[in-house]
Every structure is written in structure tokens, then in C-alpha cells.
Curated annotation (Swiss-Prot):
SUPFAM superfamilies: TPR-like (SSF48452). This is Putative pentatricopeptide repeat-containing protein At3g15200. InterPro entries: Pentatricopeptide_rpt (IPR002885), PPR_P_subfamily (IPR050872), TPR-like_helical_dom_sf (IPR011990). PANTHER family: MITOCHONDRIAL GROUP I INTRON SPLICING FACTOR CCM1, PENTACOTRIPEPTIDE-REPEAT REGION OF PRORP DOMAIN-CONTAINING PROTEIN. Residues 497-523 are annotated as: Disordered. Keywords: Repeat. Belongs to the PPR family. P subfamily. The keyword 4Fe-4S does not apply. PPR repeats lie at residues 142-172, 177-211, 212-242, 246-280, 281-315, 316-350, 351-385, 388-418, 420-454, 455-489. GO terms for cellular component: cytosolic ribosome.
Length: 523
């Protein structure tokens, strides 16, 4: 980091920390005053894995009530509440409560949770339901519902309502928990409210939650997740005496720089790790190798990969897959196959991703015999090596005739692999290119029956295919149908059809001009 930037970040951090001393949870809103609302994902710490990070958009539907809404009556009640709020979203909570009473609907924790999860992209129902929970004194067995509502409000950047709900939640003893902490960190970091995110960490003890290294990891993770890597590094340096030299925290910051694509800073921080008491582990190497391969620095990546074996830090299958894919991308197929042979012999065991990386590039260069040899090997091994929809997408993409498609479909059936919208669209594109109109209509009908389409991609393929054949009227008809379904066309599709809409007008003008000339000559 530049010296000036580092000083600014450190000053910002010190300012943030100096404002974090408050006496009670009720003062939360005084520290984070409501701002002008602005219309505009969530994981648990145990789900965070480098090189295989699963960032969920939200907390998702919880498993606390696995047997909820088993009968039609419960489902209908949820739908009724959803519709009432939808049609009366501008009404007061009191009015909505009266409507619910007239309909004989008693809100329960499970019912409210179901309705909230039906409206994860709309803040208003979540906020209304939070008010109804208070007005109807709905019994809550845990903080799960409040966490879900906070998550939705934070996601939509409705921080005035967010703070109001948190204030209400704080009045309930023991409701602010680790999950609440995650939601607060996630949503503040996502909205680039760095001060507030640090403040949440500083006041964990006021929430009745232990202040520990795992919580600090969570703060660093969310800051890096939303590109505040420089701030996260400065924060880590300022807390090094408290938490010591921690390779997991350093890996998070290294990963943050790599995700930003800043290889220069990643290399600098890598040297810091080497120079520290912490020794780089498999995650450190994997993160750095991933960054180098993405930037096309395959030579340096291979040096690190070989160094892992030499120092007995054996790479895991994700690192090996990354190396194989990078070698294939650079058209160094023999070297990729050699790495594949090595790990097949001494580990780690290859998985379906390993095979798919090879298949993608082997299909591209038409190494058909080797492709089917690997597919048969996958089928023989089974388990984590079994062919999946990605496998068959590569086989379909490079099919050259209808017979090839039939062979792939037979293989899919043999492996009990279900069709996906991606696979349907691949087949659809092939049949359009081959001018197999009967097959085109057949795939279209199958997509409608299965509920997997036709989607925006299907319409785009169809429209461009018809345009190529000069069937402009039919192409325009499909375009209008696509628009009527609320699908957003690609710019190239709009340009294509707009050009054709103007052409008849130009021709009409020319025709009128010619007629006028002829008439004047006859006069």
C-alpha cells in the first residue's frame, strides 16, 4: 500500500474505533443515525472456504421448521397474507391487521417466516411483517425471523427501517446472536459502511457475544468480500498484538487482493507472509496460484505448484484442477495430461471438475478418441467422478451432426443426468445452425413442457436464426412475444431488428420518389 493511503486508512480506522464506546444496545441508533433511505449475500463462517468460496445471497429458508406448511391450509394462509400485503402495501399496519382479523388469519412465527422468504427482493413486506409481529404479539421461539427481516432490509439498503427493526429486536433478551452479527457485518460491508461494520465487531460484548478470533475473521472476511481489502489489512496490522500471527487471517487478506486482481499487492503481501512467523499453508499457495493463473502468469504459478510438492505441502484437488485448466487454456495439453496422470497415481484423487477441465479443451481441438476414453473412465469410477451436466454441455457444444447429439443424449440417460436450460439451449442452437426446423420446434415444445424455457437465450437464438434466413416477419413476431414476457433483449438483437424496421421505410421513400419522377415525365 502507498504510504499516504495507508496513513489515511489508519486515521479512518482510529476514528472509527474511537467512536465505539456506548453504554447499551438501545443506543445503537445514536451511533448509526438513520440515513435517507436508498433503494438498492450471507453466509456462516463455517461455510467460508478459500478457492471454493460459497457466498450465499441471504440466510435462505431456515431448517428450524422442517415440517411447516405441509397441508394446503397452511400454504393458502401464507399466500393470503402475501396477497393482502401486496395489495395494501401503502396502508398502515393497523389497517392490515384489521384485514387479517376479518379473514380469520392469526400470524405465527412459521407463517411470517414463510411470507418473508417469498419476498426476499422486496423490503416493504418484511418491514410491514416486523410491525405486525409486535402489534399482534406473535410468539417467537428464536431470533431467526428477525435475522431474516434484517437481512432483507439490509440487502435492499433500507437502513432506517433496518435500525428500527434492530432496536425492537434488541428489546428481546438473548435475541441478538452470532447469526445477527453475521447479518449486520454482511449488510454494512456490502453497503460500504466500513465504520458501522467495525462498530458491530467492537460491541459484540454488549450483545452478549464473546469477542474472539473467529469473530475477527468474520469481520475481515466481509470487508475483503466487498473490496475493502486495504482497510482490512490495516485493521489486521492494528490488532496483531491482540490476535497474534494468524495464517487464516492473512490468507483472507491475500485472497482479497487476489480477488481484486491486484497481483502486485498480492505479491507484496505474500512476501509479508513468508517473512512473518506464520508459514504459508496449502490455502496460501492455492490462493496465490489461482491469482497468477488468472493473470496469465503460468510460469510463476507452476513454480509455486512444484514448490508445494518439494516442501511436502501436497496440493489439494482444487489447486490441481486450477493448474490443469490453466495449462489447457494455454494449449499445453500434454503438460496438463501429465499433471492429471501424476495426481491419479499419487493423489489427490481427481474429481468431475478435473475431468471436465480436460474435456472442455480436448473437445475444442477435436480429440474425440481421448474425450470418450475419459468419459468412460468417469463412468467407471463413478461417485465424485460421475459425468454431470457440465460434462455433457461440452460434448454437445462441439457436436458436428444430429447423430452426435443423439449419442450424447443416450449417454446422459445412461448416467441419469437431467436436462437443464443450458443443455436445452445448446441443442437448440445446434439445430438452428443446422437448419433442422422440425428438431427446433421439438426442442421448443420440450422446454415449454419441462418449465425450463424458452428463456431469453432461446428467443435470441431463434430470432437471429430466422433473421439469417431472411424471415424478418417471423423474427419480429418472436421478438414481440419475448418482450411481452418481460424478457430484456440483447442490444445486438434490438439493433438487428431496428435496422430491418427502418429498411421498408427507406424502400417506400425510394418507390414514392420514382413514381413522382415518372409522373412528372409523363406530364
Amino acid at each position: 500500500m502507498g504510504g499516504k493511503n495507508k496513513i489515511e486508512i489508519l486515521f479512518q480506522l482510529q476514528s472509527a474505533l474511537s467512536r465505539r464506546r456506548i453504554s447499551s444496545l438501545v443506543d445503537f441508533r445514536r451511533v448509526f443515525p438513520p440515513e435517507t433511505p436508498n433503494h438498492k449475500n450471507n453466509i456462516t463462517l463455517s461455510r467460508f472456504h478459500f478457492l471454493g468460496t460459497h457466498f450465499l445471497h441471504s440466510l435462505g429458508a431456515p431448517d428450524k421448521f422442517p415440517n411447516r406448511f405441509n397441508d394446503d391450509k397452511d400454504k393458502q394462509s401464507a399466500l393470503d397474507v402475501h396477497n393482502i400485503i401486496k395489495h395494501h402495501r401503502g396502508s398502515s399496519p393497523e389497517k392490515i391487521k384489521r384485514i387479517l382479523d376479518k379473514c380469520g388469519i392469526d400470524l405465527t412465527e412459521e407463517l411470517v417466516l414463510e411470507v418473508v422468504n417469498r419476498n426476499r427482493s422486496d423490503w416493504k413486506p418484511a418491514y410491514i411483517l416486523s410491525q405486525l409481529v409486535v402489534k399482534q404479539s406473535v410468539h417467537l421461539s428464536s431470533s431467526m425471523l428477525y435475522n431474516e427481516i434484517l437481512d432483507v432490509l439490509g440487502k435492499m439498503r433500507r437502513f432506517e427501517e433496518f435500525h428500527q427493526v434492530f432496536d425492537e429486536m434488541s428489546k428481546r433478551d438473548g435475541f441478538v446472536n452470532e447469526k445477527t452479527y453475521e447479518v449486520l457485518l454482511n449488510r454494512y460491508a456490502a453497503a460500504h459502511k466500513v465504520d458501522e461494520a467495525v462498530g458491530v465487531f467492537e460491541r459484540r460484548k454488549e450483545f452478549g457475544i464473546d469477542d474472539d478470533l473467529v469473530a475477527f475473521h468474520g469481520l475481515l472476511m466481509w470487508l475483503c468480500r466487498y473490496k475493502h481489502v486495504e482497510f482490512a489489512e490495516t485493521l489486521f496490522c492494528s490488532r496483531r498484538r491482540e490476535f497474534g500471527c494468524d495464517i487464516k487471517a492473512m490468507n483472507m487478506i491475500l485472497n482479497g487482493w487476489c480477488v481484486l486482481g491486484n497481483v502486485h499487492e498480492a505479491k507484496r503481501f505474500w512476501k509479508d507472509i513468508i517473512a512473518s512467523k506464520c508459514r504459508p499453508d496449502v490455502v496460501s499457495y492455492g490462493t496465490m496460484i489461482n491469482a497468477l493463473t488468472k493473470k496469465g502468469k503460468l510460469g510463476k504459478a507452476m513454480e509455486l505448484y512444484r514448490a508445494m510438492w518439494d516442501t511436502r505441502r501436497n496440493p489439494d484437488v482444487k489447486i490441481c484442477n486450477n493448474v490443469i485448466d490453466a495449462l489447457c487454456f494455454k494449449k499445453r495439453i500434454p503438460e496438463a495430461l501429465e499433471v492429471f496422470r501424476e495426481i491419479s497415481e499419487k493423489g489427490p484423487d481427481p474429481n468431475v471438475v478435473t475431468y471436465n477441465s480436460l474435456l472442455k479443451h480436448l473437445c475444442k481441438i477435436r480429440r474425440t478418441e481421448k474425450v470418450w476414453e475419459l468419459v468412460e473412465e468417469m463412468e467407471l469410477k463413478g461417485g465424485s467422478c460421475s459425468p454431470n451436466d457440465v460434462t455433457f454441455s461440452y460434448l454437445l457444444k462441439y457436436s458436428q451432426r444430429s447423430k452426435d447429439v443423439d449419442i450424447v443424449l443416450e449417454r446422459m440417460a445412461k448416467n441419469k443426468c437431467e436436462m437443464t436450460s443450458d443443455l436445452y439451449n445448446l441443442m437448440f442452437r445446434l439445430y438452428v445452425q443446422w437448419d433442422k426446423e422440425e428438431k427446433v420446434r421439438e426442442i421448443w415444445s420440450e422446454m415449454e413442457r419441462s418449465g425450463l424455457g424458452p428463456d431469453q437465450r432461446t428467443y435470441t437464438i431463434r430470432i437471429h436464426g430466422l433473421h439469417t434466413k431472411g424471415k424478418i416477419g417471423e423474427a419480429l413476431s418472436y421478438f414481440q412475444e419475448m418482450m411481452s414476457k418481460g424478457m430484456v433483449p440483447e442490444p445486438r438483437t434490438e439493433m438487428l431488428l431496428n435496422q430491418n424496421k427502418t429498411k421498408p421505410r427507406v424502400e417506400d421513400k425510394m418507390l414514392r420518389s420514382n413514381l413522382t419522377s415518372e409522373e412528372s415525365e409523363s406530364d
